């Protein structure tokens, strides 16, 4: 019932998206679920994924309090807050962010982020300091009760775990004028079944290589494809490395020369371009107001949505 209410709330936001798009709102970075999706449920059937001897049912892979771990050798032992969580509200962190910390298109990759940064972001979500430009967007709204339910010890154990992980390159970036035609999925898009193509326009098209393995089976080895417009990578590099008039841009000064973070400043290299654009837009629109977001405001206020797209396209090509 709660999920259906959230989906209805998201549907109502479609009008907001249509209006906001007129003022350069990057709607492609904020996929909405217009109605509760019909998940492909195969009750009792043992599922398999490539490279794993583990067998799980769909019901097991979708259990928020017992994370599907197809590849235990890919990561160290998980603390309980990551692998199991605590009922009723503190979901297992790895349910959404995966045992390897790779996350998905709808949320953040946590692998290798500073532990103190992770802790602060969860606390900012709990207090409302970190919000989103679409405050009823389900991936964000579902995190609020989780962030409020988790204890300090649980949070710090999870943050230490994810911080210890080495981030993996999960993106396959393709630059061009055309991209797959899309269909709405749960929280993100995927290519239509007929393989049709359409002009990419001023968008980044990002989706999991294998929707079923990613969303239903929760296989953390599934990579993501990001189609970016022709010329966007070079334009993004120019903005990030040689601002060319936008003197407020000084990414390396805070995020490090290789953009993989510096101290408690997070890495921005090799991250989901959709995620990067959402964060830039959220900060610019005043939805994110944590201490680090405030430091970013002079930077993002110098950007338009095309700048954000180009920067995100370039960052996606970098090793994490």
Model-assigned labels for residue ranges:
Residues 104-110, 263-269:
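Short cysteine/histidine-rich zinc-coordinating motifs and their immediately flanking basic loops
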Residues 266, 274, 305-306:
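Copper-binding active sites and cupredoxin-like electron-transfer domains
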Residues 71-83, 95, 100, 107, ...:
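Post-signal peptide N-terminal segment of secreted/secretory-pathway proteins
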Residues 1-10:
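Bacterial N-terminal signal peptides that target proteins for export
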Residues 95-102, 126-127, 163-166, 254-260, ...:
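Detector for the c-type heme attachment site
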């Amino acid at each position: 019932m709660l999920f259906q209410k959230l989906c209805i709330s998201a549907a109502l936001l479609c009008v907001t998206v249509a209006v906001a798009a007129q003022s350069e709102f990057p709607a492609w970075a904020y996929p909405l679920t217009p109605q509760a999706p019909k998940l492909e449920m195969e009750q009792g059937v043992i599922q398999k994924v490539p490279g794993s001897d583990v067998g799980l049912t769909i019901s097991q892979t979708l259990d928020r309090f017992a994370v599907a771990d197809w590849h235990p050798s890919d990561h160290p032992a998980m603390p309980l807050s990551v692998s199991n969580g605590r009922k009723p509200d503190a979901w297992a962190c790895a349910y959404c962010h995966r045992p390897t910390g790779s996350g998905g298109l709808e949320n953040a990759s946590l692998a290798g982020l500073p532990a103190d940064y992770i802790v602060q972001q969860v606390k900012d979500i709990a207090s409302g300091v970190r919000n989103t430009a679409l405050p009823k967007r389900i991936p964000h709204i579902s995190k609020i009760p989780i962030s409020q339910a988790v204890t300090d010890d649980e949070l710090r154990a999870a943050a230490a775990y994810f911080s210890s992980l080495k981030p993996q390159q999960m993106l396959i970036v393709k630059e061009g004028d055309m991209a797959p035609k899309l269909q709405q999925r749960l929280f993100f898009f995927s290519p239509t079944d007929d393989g049709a193509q359409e002009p990419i326009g001023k968008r980044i098209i990002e989706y999991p290589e294998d929707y079923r393995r990613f969303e239903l089976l929760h296989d953390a080895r599934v990579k993501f494809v990001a189609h970016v417009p022709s010329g966007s990578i070079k334009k993004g590099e120019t903005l990030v490395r040689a601002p060319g008039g936008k003197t407020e841009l000084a990414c390396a000064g805070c995020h490090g020369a290789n953009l993989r973070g510096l101290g408690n400043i997070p890495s921005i290299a090799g991250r989901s371009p959709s995620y990067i654009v959402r964060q830039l837009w959220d900060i610019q629109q005043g939805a994110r107001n944590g201490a680090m977001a405030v430091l970013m405001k002079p930077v993002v206020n110098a950007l338009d949505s095309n700048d954000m797209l180009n920067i995100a396209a370039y960052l996606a090509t970098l090793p994490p």
